[in-house]
A protein has these predicted regions:
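C-terminal lobe/tail of nucleotide-utilizing enzymes
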Residues: 165-231
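Hydrophobic anchor at the beta1->P-loop junction of P-loop NTPases
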Residues: 7
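Conserved glycine(s) of the Walker
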Residues: 14-15
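Inter-motif core of Ras-like GTPase G domains
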Residues: 128-152
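N-terminal phosphate/diphosphate-binding loop that engages ATP/GTP or pyrophosphate donors
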Residues: 4, 18-94, 98, 103-106
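Charged helix-capping and loop-helix junction motifs
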Residues: 128-136, 161-164, 189-194
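Hydrophobic anchor at the start of a short beta-strand
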Residues: 33-34, 114, 146, 174-175
Length: 231
């Protein structure tokens, strides 16, 4: 039975895809048969044939070296670098939760450890027409616990605590925090980490520095964060 985790962030451009690549790479190198999944990707380039290249998936695939097909990584790929609900309104098709679930099941049937990345932060709207679907609806539907990705620098305390408190109020379990763009020995960043841990009660799972190609975390400890998925 496959195991899964959801990767959310305190906002856009926090580095979730980069962290996802590190997680998948770490598991792959430990022989865990990992995979990657994302409900919707925005801001993608077109191939010469006019089709859209799922950029986040392409990065994770190349960075981690996994053999998973790009087509299986994301059911909804948009060109505009907008929130998925808006990109879908202009480009179509709108996101269908059952399609997302079906894609997730398909990946989980073929791989052992599946990392699902969110779009933006946990409050990101995926569809906003006759139906209202937010990212948290996907997380609840799939029954996934989450890892929170945050910046190590100035302003992160507020963003981390707000996200953690919101997820707690919504019944969305968090396993811990990974801090990106960390500078060892930086007084402010070290205090940021300590304050975030104190104010949220969440463990710091790892810190990631610019250009890291390996996660400073034991592969077995990482694998233990993933929980059995309910298909």
């Amino acid at each position: 039975m496959a195991k899964g985790i959801f990767l959310t962030g305190t906002g856009t451009d926090i580095g979730k895809t980069y962290i996802a690549g590190l997680l998948v790479k770490t598991l792959a190198e430990a022989g865990k048969r990992p995979a990657y999944y994302k409900a919707a990707m925005s801001g993608n380039d077109r191939r010469p044939d006019g089709s859209l290249l799922p950029g986040d998936g392409a990065f994770v695939k190349t960075f981690s070296g996994i053999d998973q097909s790009l087509e299986s990584m994301c059911p909804y790929v948009y060109e505009h670098a907008w929130s998925p609900h808006l990109a879908a309104r202009f480009e179509g098709p709108p996101i269908d939760l059952e399609v997302v679930r079906a894609g997730w099941r398909s990946v989980c049937e073929r791989y052992d450890y599946v990392t699902m990345e969110g779009s933006g932060g946990i409050l990101c709207p995926l569809r906003w027409d006759a139906q209202h679907i937010q990212l948290e609806d996907v997380v609840k539907s799939l029954g996934l616990a989450s890892i929170l990705v945050a910046e190590a620098g100035l302003g992160t305390i507020n963003s981390v605590v707000l996200t953690a408190e919101y997820m707690k109020a919504k019944g969305l379990p968090l396993k811990g925090i990974i801090f990106n763009h960390y500078h060892p020995g930086d007084t402010m960043e070290e205090d940021n980490l300590a304050m975030c841990q104190a104010l949220t009660g969440l463990p710091i799972l790892a810190t990631v520095q610019e250009g890291d190609t390996a996660l400073r975390m034991d592969p077995e400890a990482l694998a233990a964060l993933y929980e059995e998925v309910k298909l």
